[in-house]
Amino acid sequence: MKKVIFDIDGVLLSEERYFDVSALTVWEILYSPAYMGLPSERDDFKADRITEGQIAGCRSVVWGNDALLSWLKACGINSNWDMVHADLITILWLMAETYKKRSGGEKMSFTFHQPQDLKRAGQELMGLPMPKAEDVLDRWQRAVPEGLQGEEVFHALKDAMADTIDGDLSWVDLRSDFWKIHTEAFQAWYLGDDTFISLLHHMPYSAGKPGFLSREVPLAPAAHILSLFRTLKERGYDIAIATGRAREEMEIPFKLFHWYEEFDPYTMATASDAEESARRLGGPVLDKPNAFIFSCAIFGRDPDNYKAYSEETMQPAKDDEIYVCGDSYSDVIGSRRAGAKCIGILTGLEGKDAIPMFEKEGVHYVDRVTDILEKLEQK
């Protein structure tokens, strides 16, 4: 078997729009009257006509000029939904900590099952200072032991905040009702009203957004990437996808750029497959840096194999040539666990700053994805 597997964000498509949307989601959850409705120091913006300048300003404030994003990615957290979750739960933790100090030791508690619960929390938090991005980053650095990856980070945060917040902390978990609320808010921003309704079959809770689908930016001319796919197939390689995006968020831009028809959907693996496996097997969602999504891309999205993928017992043969084009540490680790070799791509969030990580891990790298042909010829 000869196969080249592509991550999407930071490899084929710019991550910038996803990071923009994640910042807008955090902003909306905290400050929109539809959610927490906390007072904002900045002028409010209208979702249906938000400007690029407003987006850039929002992202700078929320993600601390991307310092928080870099920390999360270094911890193997690639899903923007999970990045939003990490930020929001830590903001709530820090605000609850301030409340405890001011009230002489009284603890707050939160229950988040529906958007109205966020409004109640906003009323309770009113008047407390909003933590800055550097406060959130400092808390992560102090609360999360070095070496933890992915969901382990959230377990550490949950354990650490137990002394500050009273009651049930299940809302801190990934895929909790709170996670689902802000994930739908993210999808409303990214998809826009029409596509959101078409895919999810209900109105978004906070409507009026045109979406960012038409603003996706390929990391090389779309026609050049299409030519790369076709050249690889001409040279005997199968091509596949392994992404932390949900399926619909992969399919829409791929169809827009006429890439989709070059692939076999059976090996276009997404976070949706990890979700489906968790429903079938009853275990955790094995997104990156687990091997599961990469194994789906290698062997196919076959539910009969999900258990073997989850246990990492299904590996390529020794003479198979399996390469993963990825931009992050989680791609390096996940591809290795799945029995594939990683080719580093320097168009992700870290850019050329990722070179030391790739070199430390013994990973060959190229400037952009369209340069991989030369690297494959050398192998």
Give, region by region, the residue ranges found by the protein language model:
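Short amphipathic alpha-helix with an adjacent loop that forms part of the alpha/beta core around
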Residues: 371-379
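Substrate-recognition element of Asp-dependent hydrolases with the DxDx(T/V) motif
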Residues: 22, 74-75, 128, 133-178, ...
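Substrate-recognition "cap/lid" segment bordering the active-site pocket of phosphatases
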Residues: 205-209, 213-214, 218-226, 230, ...
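Active-site neighborhood of HAD-like aspartate-dependent phosphohydrolases
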Residues: 1-62, 82-85
